[in-house]
Amino acid sequence: MDKKGEIVFVNGPVVKADKMNGFIMNELVYVGKERLIGEIIELEGDLATIQVYEETTEMQPGEPVFSTGSPLSVELGPGIIGNIFDGIQRPLPVIAEKTGSFIKRGIEVNPLDRDREWTVSVKVKLGDRVKPGQVVAEVPETSIVTHRVMVPPHLSGEVVEVVPNGKYTVDQEIVTVKDDKGNNHQIRLHQKWPVRRPRPCGERLPIKKPLLTGQRVFDTFFPLGMGGTAAIPGGFGAGKTMTQHQLAKWSSADIIVYVGCGERGNEMTDVLEEFPKLEDPSTGKSMMERTVLIANTSNMPVAAREASIYTGITIAEFYRDMGYNVALMADSTSRWAEALREISGRLEEMPAEEGFPAYLPSRLAEFYERAGYVKTLGQDREGSISLIGAVSPPGGDFSEPVTQNTKRYVRCFWALDKSLASARHFPAVNWLESYSEYLEDLSGWLKENINEDWIKLRNMAMELLKEEDRLQEIVKLVGEDVLPDNQRLILEVARLIKIGFLQQNAFSKVDRFATPEKQYWMLKIIMFLYEKARPLIKNNIPISRVKNNELFSEVIKMKENIPNGDLDKFKDLMARIEEYYNRLWENYQE
């Protein structure tokens, strides 16, 4: 804190300061008389360029810049889950108590509550040898999440001091470890970690399990592997945020980190209002007991958007290291890219495509490459981070740089379609433009845990949808009536798949979440109906008789009429379909 520079230039969030000898790259600094938080992004001799994470209005040359000696870091410890932070990990509820509805410039608050006492259960004893990532104590952070206090990476040695089980604050020392050089290191309930440095892991593992979302279009047609990466691009009003909310509510991850990056404040308010009322499907507890929110809304300083993405992924890595499966939702990475473009412009850097900086692809890669399914340091634990980034291309144009560069680093592409959203088809995922490269990796798990037919049924349904798209070109020109009955049957069954299976109601208590078993049975029913109807059409029974409106309507409504826990009703429906078509065949035989 003894080093001090002097501001010589202010341009929005970009500040230049002189007399910065001894400062380091990416160091966290306090800028101006109000001590605004900033980060050094360029050093040239004694001159430093600083990215300021708060409004610089009324700042002037001559004001001081104070050193901290450490990079931009987050505090990792109990108290993160269930909390809401801004982009630089300041807890918004604490700021609201101090300054009211608006964040006062230069306000300093601790990310974690220093006064709250946590019940600590120590897991090591004197004389034990510990290694990086080993769990030394456990804290019940919420009724769902047990917080594991770990030996920091790069520290190993012998335990020389241990406190008894009891209640402790995050600042109190729990365990003291003597390293091989004879130095003592105190382990507290919290540790700091630089946001731009990925946390180390033991080993990266191949992705074998799906991240189940309860959304049929994703789980069945375009599944995401646990530890995988996905992008949700879509124009304005296509349903990106609603889809992200659904994924945050119902996905099978243990921890959800939701980063609202440059989007509207009302969207974060929706999350705050809804999540406490919702039950986690696997535990029955409140959703907020497994969720971390990072809110960096559109009216907050632009520079902090970049920090919010890194803050979120660092918190996700911390819980991954404990052995949890974490899902991080970033809404939206386009706003982060726009922040990079704005700051790059103020730095007078050479622009690349559409004004974005030339390093946009490498920044996106840095972010998405921090996902993965890993074996953690220390004990034999496995954890994962699944990254789902929304992309907001202007005018829904998927050829723009952010969407195109994101496609290079993700293996799951869920393209949202404005025309589907306008037709009230949600989730508005275009099944012809979307893809998942995880299907082959996950096929073993799906066959073993759901049914051997899963992939076969999915591929049959996809072929029908593709064939229906080709037929629609003819229908638009000459109408449906001129098509032969076998092609009209394809149109009818594709309609069943689209309305009865792919369309899902986020506000329905029955339909908002579908178990894999229910999804399998729904698709099986539709394909069973197609397989029973096709031979009848081949034998010249007219489509008007084959298409029984009552039966087709029942198939469409099965998503609402048959709850997750009552799968026997599918067998009854299948029996009725078989009975109808057998009777129809017999009548025509006579």
UniProtKB/Swiss-Prot annotation:
Catalytic activity, reaction form: ATP + H2O + 4 H(+)(in) = ADP + phosphate + 5 H(+)(out)
Name of the top EC class for this enzyme: translocase
GO molecular function, one term: proton-transporting ATPase activity, rotational mechanism
Enzyme Commission number(s): 7.1.2.2
Keyword field contains Iron: no
Recorded GO CC terms: proton-transporting ATP synthase complex
Residues noted as binding ATP in the record, renumbered to the chain: 234-241
Keyword annotations from UniProtKB, A to Z: ATP synthesis, ATP-binding, Hydrogen ion transport, Ion transport, Nucleotide-binding, Translocase, Transport
GO biological process: proton motive force-driven plasma membrane ATP synthesis
Matching Pfam families: ATP-synt_ab, ATP-synt_ab_N, ATP-synt_ab_Xtn, ATP-synt_VA_C
Family, per entry: Belongs to the ATPase alpha/beta chains family.
Protein role: Produces ATP from ADP in the presence of a proton gradient across the membrane. The V-type alpha chain is a catalytic subunit.
Protein name: V-type ATP synthase alpha chain
Species the sequence originates in: Halothermothrix orenii (strain H 168 / OCM 544 / DSM 9562)
Lineage: Bacteria, Bacillati, Bacillota, Clostridia, Halanaerobiales
